[in-house]
Every structure is written in structure tokens, then in C-alpha cells.
Amino acid sequence: MESIVDKQAVKHFLLQLQDKICQQLEATDGQAQFIEDAWQREPGEKLGGGGRTRVMREGAVFEQGGVNFSHVFGEQMPASATAHRPELAGRRFEAMGVSLVMHPKNPYVPTSHANVRFFIAEKEGEAPIWWFGGGFDLTPFYPFVEDGQHWHQTAKNICAPFGSEIYNEHKAWCDRYFYLPHRNETRGIGGLFFDDLNEWSFEQCFAYMQAVGEGYTQAYVPIVEKRKNTPFTERERQFQLYRRGRYVEFNLVLDRGTLFGLQTGGRTESILMSMPPLARWEYAYQPQAGTPEAKLSEFLVPREW
């Protein structure tokens, strides 16, 4: 039996999720608050819809971060999307999601990213084509094994009710996706990543997306609380800025969401919200052997946690 697709329930959940995550991150920071920029597409634009971009700046813990909700729709998919999925041609579509990136001030606190999204393409008289996607991943500068274990154990616990292989599959997908081939390293220590999820019933797929979205703060906040008061010097700060450069490289060169958004006339400020406020590059930099900075490379390969 075809399950009922409830777009409104998904949108309601995503708006609540944005509120909840912002509240939890504000409590963790203890100083700064998210400033909301609500936006709407102009009439006559290719895409309709709008969203709520929320940005935190110069907090006690977070140097900058953003939690974005968007819901956009159009009469037909861009050619770049239908080239790979011809069944989407001639269908009106809607895409909605919450995406976030948090860039902490303290180099001992990892950067984190999370995203959950829903896509549906509809045509009169035909069954809708829909899927869910999402995940979360962690990018430490000074990694701790116990933090990685907590992050991945939380991910395992989220996946367990949905099947014994889900964690392994979505963890491996995350390792493959957040990989910089020109640097031969992963962006961080991974987590979960999934896309095109529609093989279960709508209810089951939606439940998994909800679990991943709500699991992000369970995975991240305890690590932030543990590391946010660690003393650091200018050396660690400079290394953090250098490593943020890799984050920029991934987002601008490789990230499908960023590229799709910019190529299809998405809202540029919201798309580039994920960028760090400061980053640096240094020609042919190599950390000295035996230093904490050199240790990071051991973590930037897929591993079992």
C-alpha cells in the first residue's frame, strides 16, 4: 500500500528543529544569540518560497555559526538535476531542509555540520517522487579519541532502530562524501550521510530523518561542553585558521549542495553561511613531526570507532 506523503508534517518538524537546535546552541554558548533574517523569493523569480536564516556571531564559544531553514519550490527542475534523473522532467518540485555549521573560537572545540532535507516532485495524476537526505559530521583540529567515540556511538544509537547495517552504510557514505581528493584526506572524522532515501515507507523514512536531526545536538553539545574552556595559545589558533582553509576548499570546490544552490539561483548569503569568518593558507606547510598538529593527519582517514 502506498504510504501518504505529508509535506506539512515535514515542514512543521523542520521549523521546530531549527528552533530547538538554536536554543540548545545558545545555551551552550551562554552569551551570543542567533539573529534571524527571514526571507522570501520575489514574485516572478524561477524559484518560489522562502526561509529563516539564523546567524550567531562573536559568542563566548562560537566565533560564527548559522542554522538555516529553507523551503523553495518551482514549476520545473533545472536541467542540471533532470540530466541524471529524467523521471523528474516536467514535474513541479519542492525542497525543504535545515542546514547548519558552527565554527567555534577555541581550537580544541571541533567545527560541526548537520543537514536534514526533503524533496518531492509532483505531477497531476501520477504518484509523487520523493526522498529524504541528511546527516552530520565533525571536523576537529585537535582530535580526542573519546570525542570521536562519543560522536560515532551517538550515530550508532540513532541508526540502530532502523536496521543493523544502517550505521555502517551511512558512516561509509559520509567518509566518501566528505573527502578532499586534491588533499588526499577526509574533511574530518565523519558521522552519517544519506541521500535519496525512499526505500522504506514515508513514515519510516521521515522518522529516520527526524532521529538524525534531533541527534545532532546529542552528539555535539557534550563535546563542546567538555572542551570549550581548554586553554590555548596563538599557535593553536593559527593552526585552526589553517585547517579552516580545508573547510573552505571542500565547500566551494566539492560540496554538491553549495554548487547546486549557486548554479540554480539560490540565496547566496544563506548558501555561504557555512563559511568560516576567518581562514588562512600557507604555502607547503607541514606540521613538525611529533607535535599535536601532526597528529591530526592520523584521524583524517576512514576508521572504525
UniProtKB/Swiss-Prot annotation:
Gene3D superfamilies noted in UniProt: Coproporphyrinogen III oxidase, aerobic
Claim: Cytoplasm is one of the keywords in the record: yes
Originating organism: Vibrio cholerae serotype O1 (strain ATCC 39315 / El Tor Inaba N16961)
Family note: Belongs to the aerobic coproporphyrinogen-III oxidase family.
Cofactors demanded by this protein: a divalent metal cation
Gene: hemF
Location(s) in or outside the cell: Cytoplasm
Residues annotated for a divalent metal cation binding in this entry: H103, H113, H152, H182
Protein name as catalogued: Oxygen-dependent coproporphyrinogen-III oxidase
Ligand binding (substrate): S99, N115, V116, R117, G265, G266, R267
Keyword annotations: Cytoplasm, Heme biosynthesis, Metal-binding, Oxidoreductase, Porphyrin biosynthesis
